Amino acid sequence: MVGMMRKTKILVTLGPSLENKLDKAINLIDGVRFNMSHATTDYCEKFLNILEKNNIAKVMDLKGIKIRIKEVKLKNKILKMGEKVVIGEDIKLNYNIDTIEEGHFILINDGKIKLRVVEKTDKIIAVVEVGGEIKEGMGVNLPDTRIELPIIDETDLKNIKFAVEKDFEYIALSFVRNKEDVKELKDIISEYKGDCEVISKIETKEGLKNIKEIARESDGVMVARGDLGVEVPIENIPIEQKNILRIANRYGILSITATQILDSMINNPFPTRAEVTDIANAIYDGTDCLMLSNETTIGKYPIEAIKVLNKVAKVADEHYEEFGDRVCLEVESIDEGLVYAVYELYKKLNTKLVITPTYSGRTAKLISKLRINSKIIAPTPNIRTLKRLRLVWGVESCLMEEFDDMEKIINTCREMAKKEIGKGIYLITLGHPIGQKKTNTIKVESI
């Protein structure tokens, strides 16, 4: 059984800082992310054995569509406030600029440099509102502009094929604009005969606008606060985070909060008070999982950052019932309705444990969304489901080889209950008869 004391899960990004210390981190984490903006498939390959051996969830994060400065033709590459530049001449992008209109903002280097288009005739002229040094290769955000680029390119296709072949549990899609983007990735995964689940990264204005349709089509969403904080006013980030997480939980899908979780620990062995508070608030907003990025790729203290996240998450989890957001699931099926019955029984009977045998993991995810204080154990015959559930709040997944006989399943659950709680009331959820794809039964038992 996958042992854990905290309920909020931890996903780390693998990079130079952590790669030689992964063995020290392996018992502190639930998933590993490969950022394909920097990593290669050869790099991923080196770590697959240790991840498989420890049943760690693998997430491939596709590089996605990213606009960059292609060429700077200015003599002075330090832009000054009030200066005017011609986009496409003074500053060339790797993007067709025809869709940029007067009044649109052009944000460079994570929003540190800000231009506003003041004229569009045969040329696009922008005035510098916030200056700074610009270089070729810097990232560019166009928050007001509809980006007409394919969501997946040739490099992404090769990486998706690799992820399918190597049984990655999740593929994360960057800069998701609408449900069609999600469907495109799902179709490609199907063409490669894979079953990787799709995490949609919400990091653009268009993604925010279409968050409900994106969430319905996705297996999970990520609050990607880096680019999102460039695309929308930074003061709106807490509200957008709460909204994204609430919608994800309403639809019963995985939710991940990312970017600058412990940013100060890139260079310091201790977090700031604000970071600790941010972690707890993300948990109380309803996130399943917290993700470290630069902290574990280029940071000086990757293990320390992981340990801090563990400690803070554990304490926040203990107080979820006092301060956490109460999830309201969309009830559109029998199994969605059934989990509310689980919640009522939990409240009335003070149940200590819920055991939810599952093939796909869906019922375990739904029960997780209710944020009950009972332990949730999800036995499964499917190793992929076991690893996917590593990222789901409060769920402890384990293998159950005997999954074709109802009586054997129930007896195994009873043995688990004796081991886990010794005494007390517990629940078992089941799909009856065997092979039923929907959970439709709750057994209430006591020891």
UniProtKB/Swiss-Prot annotation:
InterPro entries according to UniProt: Pyr_Knase (IPR001697), Pyrv/PenolPyrv_kinase-like_dom (IPR015813), Pyrv_kinase-like_dom_sf (IPR040442), Pyrv_Knase-like_insert_dom_sf (IPR011037), Pyrv_Knase_AS (IPR018209), Pyrv_Knase_brl (IPR015793), Pyrv_Knase_C (IPR015795), Pyrv_Knase_C_sf (IPR036918)
A cellular-component GO term for this protein: cytoplasm
Binding residues for K(+): 35, 37, 61
Site residues, Transition state stabilizer: 201
Metabolic or biological pathway: Carbohydrate degradation; glycolysis; pyruvate from D-glyceraldehyde 3-phosphate: step 5/5
Chain positions recorded as ATP binding sites: 35-38, 68
GO process terms (BP): glycolytic process
Alphabetically ordered keywords of this record: ATP-binding, Glycolysis, Kinase, Magnesium, Metal-binding, Nucleotide-binding, Potassium, Pyruvate, Transferase
Amino acids binding Mg(2+): 203, 227
A Pfam match: PK_C
Positions bound to substrate: 33, 226-227, 259
Enzyme class: transferase
Catalysed reactions listed for this entry: pyruvate + ATP = phosphoenolpyruvate + ADP + H(+)
GO terms for MF: ATP binding; kinase activity; magnesium ion binding; potassium ion binding; pyruvate kinase activity
Assembly and binders: Homotetramer.
Similarity remark: Belongs to the pyruvate kinase family.
Protein's name according to its UniProt entry: Pyruvate kinase
Species per Swiss-Prot/TrEMBL record: Methanocaldococcus jannaschii (strain ATCC 43067 / DSM 2661 / JAL-1 / JCM 10045 / NBRC 100440) (Methanococcus jannaschii)
